[in-house]
């Protein structure tokens, strides 16, 4: 089974090697037919402390690092865009 990958925005990087990522999902309400926005915060492991508040990042399911931290940072979009820009 493949690991889930989510995209979100870093809302906190105050703790060592941990970031809090807000992931927003949208769906259509079954009765009202209105688009509803819901968000959830995920604690993710950031080994190198590279992610900063406001960055858009990808997180991936992983082994439990602690009671609440079961996701890890895959890459941040700013670093990926910078690497693509220097490679091109």
Curated annotation (Swiss-Prot):
<dbReference type="GO" id="GO:0019843">
    <property type="term" value="F:rRNA binding"/>
</dbReference>
<keyword id="KW-0689">Ribosomal protein</keyword>
<dbReference type="InterPro" id="IPR019984">
    <property type="entry name" value="Ribosomal_uS17_bact/chlr"/>
</dbReference>
<dbReference type="GO" id="GO:0006412">
    <property type="term" value="P:translation"/>
</dbReference>
<protein>
    <recommendedName>
        <fullName>Small ribosomal subunit protein uS17</fullName>
    </recommendedName>
</protein>
<keyword id="KW-0687">Ribonucleoprotein</keyword>
<keyword id="KW-0699">rRNA-binding</keyword>
<dbReference type="InterPro" id="IPR012340">
    <property type="entry name" value="NA-bd_OB-fold"/>
</dbReference>
<dbReference type="GO" id="GO:0022627">
    <property type="term" value="C:cytosolic small ribosomal subunit"/>
</dbReference>
<dbReference type="InterPro" id="IPR000266">
    <property type="entry name" value="Ribosomal_uS17"/>
</dbReference>
<keyword id="KW-0694">RNA-binding</keyword>
<dbReference type="Pfam" id="PF00366">
    <property type="entry name" value="Ribosomal_S17"/>
</dbReference>
<comment type="subunit">
    <text>Part of the 30S ribosomal subunit.</text>
</comment>
<comment type="function">
    <text>One of the primary rRNA binding proteins, it binds specifically to the 5'-end of 16S ribosomal RNA.</text>
</comment>
<dbReference type="GO" id="GO:0003735">
    <property type="term" value="F:structural constituent of ribosome"/>
</dbReference>
<comment type="similarity">
    <text>Belongs to the universal ribosomal protein uS17 family.</text>
</comment>
């Amino acid at each position: 089974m493949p690991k889930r990958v989510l995209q979100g925005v870093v809302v906190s990087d105050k703790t060592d090697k941990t970031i809090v990522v807000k992931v927003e999902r949208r769906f259509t309400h079954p009765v009202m037919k209105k688009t509803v926005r819901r968000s959830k915060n995920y604690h993710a492991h950031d080994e190198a402390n590279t992610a900063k508040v406001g960055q858009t990042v990808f997180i991936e399911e992983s082994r439990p690092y602690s009671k609440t931290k079961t996701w890890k940072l895959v890459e941040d979009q700013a670093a990926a865009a910078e690497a693509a820009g220097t490679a091109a």
